[in-house]
Amino acid sequence: HGQTDDGMRTLLGFLHFPAVAAQLRERSRVEAPTLHREAPRVLDVIYLSTLDLSRLPATTVGEGALRYLIVADKGEMGVRAVREAVAFGATPVVLYSAQDDSGALQVRLAERHGGFGISLEGSFRESYANPVQIAARIHEVYAERFGSEGAPQALACSALYPGYGPLAENTAAIEHFRHEGIVFVGPMQDVVESAGDKRKFRLLAQSIDDDAVVPGIVLEDDDPMEIVGLIRAAHRAERFSFPGRLKAANGGGGRGQVIVEAPERVPGAVEKVLGEIAANGWDPGVMFEQNIAETIHLEVQVLRDRYGNTRHFGMRDCTEQRASQKIQEEAPPALLRAYPGLTERICELAVRIADEVGYVGACTVELMFKDGHYYLLEMNTRIQVEHPVTEAAHRIRTADGLQPLDLVALQFGIAAGAPIPFAQEDVVATHAAREFRINAESWKPKLKDSRDGKVGMFLPNAGVFDVIELPEERTVIAALAADGVHGIQELGIRFDCGFEPGDTLVNKDPTFGKLIVSVATDEAHAEERYELLRRASIEVLRRLRIEGRQVLSNGQVIEGSRFETNREDHIRVLESDLMRQHGRGPVPDRHVGWVVDMLRRG
């Protein structure tokens, strides 16, 4: 009935009654899969009519009309997005820097599959992070390609996918795209502002669970003397104790924060953080929190569609880090086996937060963990670098059996107006998985790190790839069996890489690939699965061949040189005494700084 014009008018008339609108909204959420399949226009109208779109604006093309995916990321994520677009049935359109990436793998792949590239002028920041240039170039190229009459229709069937690149959490960029008529795959700017701002996230989390945040205060002021006075007053009121941590509300990756050892050091810390806020163009605002040292880093993967269906995919352990950057991730976390029920409690909190802000797309809720207590930190309003480890650890139960989890494909489906096509109970953890960020860098024990003044640091290098070769699963299992290691029922080896042999990595993010190893065990070895994962990962890393030669910053090859990666450093981490204990249960000395501490000790 709703597909006729009279029926549509009747539906819209009912929506003047709030109680009816609420019932219709809930019914559309529950029946979204059926409606999307049988009457997508009706589902679109109900969605657009029953939600307060001044707060939760439309974020999808609707009616499953997504035909062009504009990829706005590069490297391994750009390559993944192009391949997923092709598998989704959409034409890949790749944004690229003419200065740096005209021959990049993601551009070649798009053209190979009937897509096209849109060149941008300037360096990384001037191109990939420039929404004004990007929107203008999209309109220009679409007009050239589809004609002045066809361009608006083609753009209406397009969506821009930011991956985890510089546009992903950029509220000004998201708003600009909205005004330019470009659908953004992910939440709109109002949701990013409320969920991605650490201050607002802290207040929201505190309203749900007062014990789920670190003791501290949120400060909206930008006057240094006022901030110092408020911090000192809160300390006198015993709101927190020292040492503390002063953080910019919009910092990240270890930037915009400083540890404050004692009250007398507050003024210097305030001056430093406010200087970083000004230098980076961040919105003003800081938080002062009690510093909880040597914590475990955990996070929850969440997905939500525009109809209000929210799913979580368990947790990840991202404690292995260097310079506040993750280098290994694990799913599900081995240590949480010692805390029954905690995973579900934390995941339910993350789902409530996503529901509260009206999130649309993929997001991650990050938290610290120590001695059985958790502290929610922030929501990353984008797909994370480490999402493949969650995919490798989970399957989706369907009528046809267990199917792989593909978070990027689900993001595309949501952008096309589709509901999440499975229930929470259909998400099944089947494997233990570990991800290794393969970086163009290696550990140099004699170099002094200017960031902390200590000796020992990872030094990046650039190079041309000659060989990129993965071992076969059966070869690894046979090698393990020969060494007396048994019980692996299924071994997964996956390598997400932004390059092919012959490509050159220069002046780019050192992370050029992600190796994901996963194991499923037979019932007799279920308790040993994390030790089996460790042993399998070592064997895979040893057999992973990445060879090349170093290049200068201009791309000139240094003959006789060897392109260096952190592959051997990953093996050293896995062979450490701490990681041998990790598979059996919580390890007291394991925290976000342990890897660098261990390497520095030699």
Regions inferred by a protein language model and the residue ranges of each:
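ATP-binding N-terminal substructure of ATP-dependent carboxylate-amine bond-forming enzymes
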Residues: 2-209, 220-229
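Bateman (tandem CBS) regulatory domains
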Residues: 188, 206-212, 326-334
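Conserved anion/nucleotide-ligand pocket segment
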Residues: 246
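Glycine/aspartate-rich loop-and-adjacent alpha/beta segment that forms the canonical ThDP
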Residues: 258
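ATP-dependent carboxylate activation and anion-phosphoryl transfer catalytic cores
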Residues: 12-20, 27-94, 115, 128-129, ...
